[in-house]
UniProtKB/Swiss-Prot annotation:
Gene expressing this chain: infC
GO molecular function: ribosome binding; translation initiation factor activity
Quaternary data: Monomer.
UniProt entry tagged with the keyword Cytoplasm: yes
GO CC terms, sorted: cytosol; membrane
One GO-annotated biological process of the protein: ribosome disassembly
Subcellular location: Cytoplasm
Protein name, per record: Translation initiation factor IF-3
Keywords, ordered alphabetically: Cytoplasm, Initiation factor, Protein biosynthesis
Amino acid sequence: MSKENEVLLNEDIRAREVRCVGDDGTVYGVVSRDEALKIAEKQGLDLVLVAPDAKPPVCKIMDYGKFRYQQEKKQKEAKKKQKVIEIKEIKLSIKIAQNDINYKVKHAVEFLQDGKHVKFRVFLKGREMSTPEAGVAMLEKVWELVKDVADRDKEPLVEGRYVNMLVTPKKG
């Protein structure tokens, strides 16, 4: 366990006086650590330091094993609910033929229908670097073909040797 996530319990708590709260919400007030330990022991539970920075530190009387299990369960649930967004990248060039554009747009539409985000990239070679507007124009041309099924997340943007545009599936 890392230092940040380490929880002090029972005899590991160094404070002389603590503000003690019971598992059921009972407030015992400010008591000595030893007295709080006796209360916890009497109930068959652990004394857990929950707010070490407070003056005096706050301790809660609880079943630590059960508490840790519930925390891990919550973390697993949160991890399950996270949705990983997949971004597909489609590379184009300024001198691409219309048929090739149609082919790549067809694939982009399939990705968008699957719920994936699509990043269009135009690579600027050699002298094309002096006219990045041509790359922006290419992406505007592509946008006209995909705007029925997509929302534009990012306008065409020049980033180094690339002109990028990010589109996401249309909502609804």
